[in-house]
Amino acid sequence: MKNKSKKRLILAFSMLLALLSLPSCLKKDDTTILINNPQDIPLITGFLPSDLLAQFGEQNVHFGDQPPVIDMEFVSQHEYVSVTTSAPSFPPPGTVSPIAHYHKINQQYLQIAEYLSMSSEEAYCNVISPVYLTGHGNDFTVYYHESPQTDGSPEHAVLFSGTLTADGVKNFMYGYKILRYNDSVVPITAYPVNTIFVFKDRDGLAEKTNWYNDSLVHR
């Protein structure tokens, strides 16, 4: 009887240790990403306008619920691919923008991340959270809505995609649609609502870099 009691005590103690160690197994580390509740992830086909997805190109949208783990800073140089406006101020396709675009993705869960962006013309970066990811293998697509930052600035539906490599993001594509402006006065220099822009990186690789520090965040 004593041996049976001792065995039960050892078994109970082992189960207690297992339960106590469980939370540490669920924490995010370099090799572990929490599994999302699928209800938390809006489908890209319902979240973004269909005409934006069509203009971006189905071949450039990477579908799947197993995107790569992304924790990277990279920079892209945009080349104009297409735009759905005849505004004379818009450069023709093939024109490379002189403005560098900086990106940082901090993946918090399998399909949810914090995204930080800045252009070489800005003094601080924009923090957008959450953004959503879809993809498989090393191919991914990030998609989100960007709210107006100032009076007269637009709300955008945005996506960008590519293939994660050790050097950055290969086959980088970026597109957005102007959904609305946040006040009744639209600047005369602004592009009209529903305009869609699509860009690619000028040499096909948005290069890995280190650009971010806390002082760049607008508080």
What is each PLM-predicted segment?
Residues 80-130:
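N-terminal glycine/threonine-rich, aromatic-flanked beta-hairpin/loop signature
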Residues 21-24:
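C-terminal motif of bacterial Sec signal peptides marking the signal peptidase cleavage site
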Residues 95-99, 125-129, 152-160, 172-174, ...:
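Short, surface-exposed coil-to-beta transition loops
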Residues 26-89, 204-219:
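Amphipathic/hydrophobic helical signal segments and adjacent flexible N-terminal regions
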Residues 157-219:
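Glycine-rich, aromatic-bearing surface loops/beta-hairpins
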Residues 75-83, 117, 141-149, 174-181:
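Generic short beta-strand segments
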Residues 2-13:
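Bacterial N-terminal signal peptides that target proteins for export
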Residues 70-73, 110-116, 135-143, 170-172:
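Short, hydrophobic/aromatic-rich segments at coil-to-beta transitions
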